[in-house]
From Swiss-Prot:
Residues 39-400 form the GBD/FH3 domain. It is found in: Cytoplasm. The gene is rid1. Residues 16-27 have a biased composition (Polar residues). One of its GO terms (biological process) is actin cytoskeleton organization. It holds the Pfam family Drf_GBD. The keyword Methyltransferase does not apply. The lineage of its organism: Eukaryota, Fungi, Dikarya, Ascomycota, Taphrinomycotina. It comes from Schizosaccharomyces pombe (strain 972 / ATCC 24843) (Fission yeast). SUPFAM superfamilies: ARM repeat. This is GTPase-binding protein rid1. Residues 16-47 are annotated as: Disordered. Keywords: Cytoplasm.
Length: 400
């Protein structure tokens, strides 16, 4: 009997793993193939062939195969019948689970699910489906989701996840999908209006981006920057929007607690925390900045849409430089929205914080062939600086 159990365990584990859940994941389209049929026990004439078919897929030595084939016919029939019953039970459970799983289609369904589900129990696939619907559905569907409170619910959940002391991989995955939901909602006017009135929420996102709890993936961090960019674009008064974003990125020190002589010698670097984030990226992918002789061509338009060679598709280098480019594009647009006097003041503050140094001594050295998006952002900065008579040679050539 012990040998019989061993054979069942061996064949059952291997055969069921090969055709278990993987063949029946496609919900209602596959229910017909997983019908509740009573397992039919093979006849004595069919038994040898049926048992051989069961043995063939297994990775067994020739001696083990011969030993199994030499078993008594009664034992063979019992093994096959037992495995068929186990397989049918597994299929029945799967179909029952598929029928019980709720179908989320309407905006209120998703809002109710997010509100009534604990963070640890949220299904990432449902939030992913919501992000896809917000991006691809009609405008009226997205506006209904926002009108019914979806915008606030999504931001509230993001805030809860960002406040967790220890975030797991599941939390980061859900956070990414929720951020994509916010990004998708910003494609409609109603979403931009809500975002422009959500200064506190945007401040929380920036704090998350520049904190030690920031998402690990550069792609997720880039989505955060894009949401901040949308927050700026949502302002009708570009000067007011630019100053507000700059204030959110600046360091808020309590200067009243400083000693008087320290105030006199202290150099104000309001965006130092922002630039440190870019410096950390340059250290994490240090091997990218190895083209010392690069010079940014002001006349050349770097085509950002190109076919990258194999090995540079979706690599960490591409993600890192794309993330850095998103920051520089944001800075360029913020500066463009300010009058000349305020723009020069912000340029000086960014320079003292270390932006120009890292652009000229690090980002300029990335490959012009493989990281065109970053070089286009640098070119835009240099062209704007040249128009304003601001020194730009350090960024263009790496030397003054």
């Amino acid at each position: 009997m012990n040998s019989l159990r061993s054979v069942k365990r061996l064949l059952g584990a291997r055969s069921l793993s090969s055709d278990g859940l993987s063949e029946s994941v496609n919900s209602s389209d596959r229910e017909d193939s997983l019908s509740f049929q009573t397992p039919s026990t093979p006849s004595e004439d069919e038994m040898p062939q049926c048992f051989e078919d069961l043995i063939k897929p297994q990775v067994l030595s020739s001696e083990a195969s011969k030993s199994l084939l030499s078993l008594n016919e009664g034992i063979k029939m019992e093994i096959v019948s037992s495995l068929q019953q186990k397989d049918q039970k597994k299929r029945n459970k799967l179909i029952a689970w598929m029928r019980k799983k709720p179908c989320y289609e309407q905006p209120d369904d998703f809002i109710s699910y997010i509100v009534n589900t604990k963070i640890d129990s949220i299904d990432e696939s449902i939030i992913h489906k919501l992000a896809l619907l917000l991006r691809n559905e009609q405008v009226i569907w997205v506006e209904k989701f926002i009108h019914n409170g979806g915008f606030g619910v999504v931001f509230c959940t993001i805030d809860k996840i960002s406040r967790l002391e220890w975030r797991e991989e599941l939390h980061d995955s859900i956070l990414e999908q929720l951020l994509l939901c916010v990004k998708a909602m910003c494609t409609v006017q109603r979403g931009l209006e809500c975002l422009s009135q959500s200064t506190y929420n945007v401040e929380r996102l920036i704090s998350l981006l520049l904190s030690k709890k920031q998402p690990c993936d550069f792609v997720v961090r880039e989505v955060l920057v894009q949401i901040v960019h949308s927050f700026y674009k949502a302002h009708l008064d570009k000067e007011e929007g630019a100053m507000q974003v700059f204030s959110l990125f600046s360091i808020k020190d309590d200067k009243d607690e400083e000693v008087e002589f320290l105030k006199n010698v202290r150099v104000d670097r309001p965006f130092r925390r922002w630039i440190i984030e870019l410096e950390d990226v340059s250290r994490n992918v240090f091997w990218v900045w190895n083209h010392d002789s690069n010079v940014i061509d002001l006349e050349k338009q770097y085509n950002q849409v190109y076919e990258a060679p194999l090995g540079f598709i979706g690599g960490i280098e591409t993600e890192a430089t794309s993330y850095v480019a998103a920051h520089i594009h944001l800075i360029n647009e913020l500066l463009e929205g300010l009058p000349l006097e305020k723009r020069q003041r912000k340029r000086l503050e960014l320079q003292l914080s270390g932006l120009e140094r890292i652009m000229g001594l690090r980002f300029r050295k990335s490959s012009q062939k493989f990281h065109k998006k970053l070089h286009e952002a640098l070119r835009e900065w240099i062209v704007a600086a040249k128009i304003d008579d601001w020194p730009y040679k350090l960024v263009q050539t790496g030397s003054t």
